Swiss-Prot record:
One of its GO terms (cellular component) is cytoplasm. Belongs to the IF-3 family. InterPro entries: T_IF-3_C_sf, T_IF-3_N_sf, Translation_initiation_fac3_CS, Translation_initiation_fac_3, Translation_initiation_fac_3_C, Translation_initiation_fac_3_N. This is Translation initiation factor IF-3-like. GO terms for biological process: ribosome disassembly. The keyword Lyase does not apply. GO terms for molecular function: ribosome binding; translation initiation factor activity. The keyword Repeat does not apply. PANTHER family: TRANSLATION INITIATION FACTOR IF-3 (PTHR10938), TRANSLATION INITIATION FACTOR IF-3, MITOCHONDRIAL (PTHR10938:SF0).
Length: 163
């Protein structure tokens, strides 16, 4: 079970005094909570407890909605995978190949790494040289936007990271 610590805002703050940081990041020192609330309301912002300490909490005057939005955005970015994988067969058509290369260009421009893997099954193993040439072609096609992080011709995998 994950315990989410809820931030206290405005009238939820029960402490008689807070250590205040105003909306311009100036340290205001120890101030009564009521007075800090009045300051926050005068600039049409919220009083948010940033750090709950034993003696007096540290409160900051800011836009609480904007703070929540930025926190949610940071969580989304940290959860996003950074390695995208594209799988090929040795006899892929030109249109499919170009489509995958375009996708890889978009991912590399966003900052994600791209891993290309060529899968050989059964009788396709006789096309191993052709698959190796395809890996080289992928590297040359993406050389403008990315650089090779690892190239393994034995297992037919190449990983390209943004340049």
């Amino acid at each position: 079970m994950i315990v989410v610590q809820k931030q206290l805002i405005n009238s939820q703050i029960k402490s008689p005094q807070v250590f205040l940081i105003d909306h311009e990041n100036n340290n205001r020192g120890l101030i009564d909570t009521y007075e800090a609330l009045q300051l926050a309301q005068s600039v049409e912002l919220d009083l948010v407890v940033v750090s709950q300490s034993k003696d007096t909490p540290v409160a900051k005057i800011l836009n609480y909605g904007k703070l929540q939005y930025q926190k949610k955005k940071r969580q989304g970015q940290s959860a996003r995978p950074t390695v995208k994988e594209v799988r090929f067969r040795p006899n892929v058509g030109a249109a499919d190949y170009n489509l995958r290369i375009e996708q890889a260009l978009q991912w590399l421009s966003k900052g994600d790494s791209v891993k290309f893997a060529i899968r050989l099954r059964g009788r396709e193993n006789q096309y191993r040289e052709q698959a190796g040439q395809m890996l080289e072609r992928i590297v040359t096609d993406l050389s403008q936007v990315g650089k090779v992080q690892s190239l393994d011709k034995r297992s037919l995998i190449v990983q390209i990271m943004p340049a």
